[in-house]
Amino acid sequence: MSIDGYLARDDHRLDWLIGTEGEEDTRYEEFYASVDTLIMGRNTYEQVLKLSPDEFPYEDKTCYIVSRTLQDSHTGTHIVREDVLSFIKNLKNEKGQHIWIVGGGELLQALLKEKLVDELYLQIAPVMIGKGIPLFPPTEQESRFSLQQVNQYKQIAEMHFVLKEDH
């Protein structure tokens, strides 16, 4: 995300990330290997398809798309239309590795409100874009996390947080 908390420009473009020194050096492969399930909203899903039109980049994982309006999805993905919070609560109780919420916005906010997010991995690029799609939309919800680790990959900072149990 940008220093000022945005995932993308208003039109979902990520051009501001291009050329950020270190973006290719993060431990993404290690993180990705620790995940067996991905969940994303329709907007994130459509952006993934635009960025990778020839091959869906998450074919080796179980992938759920949260949308009430999406009619069709890529082979191997599953559309979740109703009662997303109950679906995710049940999913968290299944055996497996980590669940990755790809993107952010409204879906992430709803999950935070219900305390369904255990950890946050935030990567911050040294760019301010001024406006765009925020990772965390405004809310009345307060959540407390404990900082576990900070890594630097050239110009990218990564912070790992764990939700505090007592809050």
Describe these PLM feature segments.
Residues 1-167:
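Enzymes that bind and transform nitrogen-containing heteroaromatic metabolites
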